[in-house]
Amino acid sequence: MRTWVCLVASYIFYGWWDWRFLSLIVFSTVMDWWFGLWITYHDAPEETRDRCENGSPGLRFFGRLTRWAHGLQLQRRTILVFSMVMNLGFLGFFKYFGFFADNLAALIREMGMTPSWTTLHIILPVGISFYTFQSMSYTIDVYRRELSWEPSLLKFATFIALFPQLVAGPIVRAADFLYQMSEDKRFDWNRWNSGMGRVLWGFFKKIAIADSIAPFVDQC
């Protein structure tokens, strides 16, 4: 239940800015999770197949899809390349396509010609750099056999979309996060008091110290 709450809250938070980009992060999440499954299937096909068949209906579906894809006889490295091309392709299109297209059009106009295309004003999805590299790091770690494939798409999606770090970072490695979602978390007053103490101390330094000396620093 806790994981569902975190995931739904994260998607609401992300979609509040522009719901159209929810499809992008969901698609990237599902594909990279499946690429991790596909890579793992190469190493242990029988164990992975049994794990999928004994799982949820969604896991059984992706298990059968992976068995079909495995018949294509693609190498593990090729699957990793698929993942990287997809992720970097999305990132490059949304973040850099408009920049290069506008500059190329300006250069052509300086040469006395008229560009034959209309430059696109592409909106940059919030946090695309963070969740792209975070998702890629998972696939790369699975490929290097430094991390086991995560059988729960729910946990993996929460790892990618968790709203506290989605739009401002830092980029979190799957090995440092996913195992925590399986731990039994209990409310702890000592941790609460310690955390609130840090928050209040930060407010004090910002309001009482930083804001007070800011006018003098600006004049220097």
Describe every region a protein language model picked out.
Residues 1-220:
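Membrane-embedded transmembrane alpha-helical bundles that form the catalytic cores
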